[in-house]
Amino acid sequence: MTALESVATYLPSGRVPIEDLAGQLELTPMQVKLFRRYHRLAEVRREPDGTLLDLLLAAVANLDGLRGREHEIRYVLHARTFPVVVPYPVNPVHALCRILGLDHAVAFAVTHHACATGLLALDVAGRLLAHDGDGLALVLAGEKTFTRDAQLVPETSVFGEGASACLVRHAGPRDRLLAYAAHVRGEFDDELSDDPSAYQREYHSSLADVILDAAAQAHTGLGEVQLILPHNVNVVAWQRLCRRIGYPISQVLLDNVPVAGHVFCADAFLNYQTARERGLLRPGDRYIVAAAGAGRGATFSAMVFEH
């Protein structure tokens, strides 16, 4: 049973208010007000002089569980929202492996589930490790806002920079994965769809369905779920979803939305770290990690863990 061994995160110190992004993102004053007052997106983190490699290395530097165990790493996975995250031929994951002495590991990117790819990467890592005994996988997430598409989800969210690093093993006592559900919806194609608004109309019901699917697979009622760790798209989306499924919004960890924005696939790990730091999870607690990603189709994903 896949388990999280250790999680670390990194957020740049540079804070950029939403208002300061209006010019480059071509936002009207009304759109800025909508993001701040309605979606509760106040600022994002940026590191203008840093590279993606810098972001990932900073997260790994905080991963105490890796030190002295580099030889146990079998796989290094980079969960990406976008298939292309750096200009060719730059390869930050291979560079990271060289720097950290992980050249022996199989390193590759996981993508095409957009912002839900972080959950896919955990699942892939666990499946690979099932054949590797006591080996570990290093799952990385985080991207640079180096294109306009990587800065803004129109009318919905603003991307921020940051990164996470997670050690995964096939089985273990800490944060055991009980269930994973992923619903891939190819009809929600933002370029080829005859009805571009269909994704927005069905977003809440689709995300609710996958959360309930994962909970059912884990034989867990929502009343037994201590916490939901969301993707940080905005606050109002989760308020609506909670009303739909009858789950208390107070048990959805949304504190990082106003101060970090939507940090690509790293949201779940940032929120996990916050939950640990604040003592929101006790041994035996069950929690759900949920995310949705859109682009060439859409993916709605949820995982149930036991802390």
How should these model regions be labeled?
Residues 41-48, 81-82, 106-111, 150-153, ...:
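A short glycine/serine-rich beta->alpha loop
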Residues 130-162:
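Flexible, glycine-rich active-site loops centered on histidine and acidic residues
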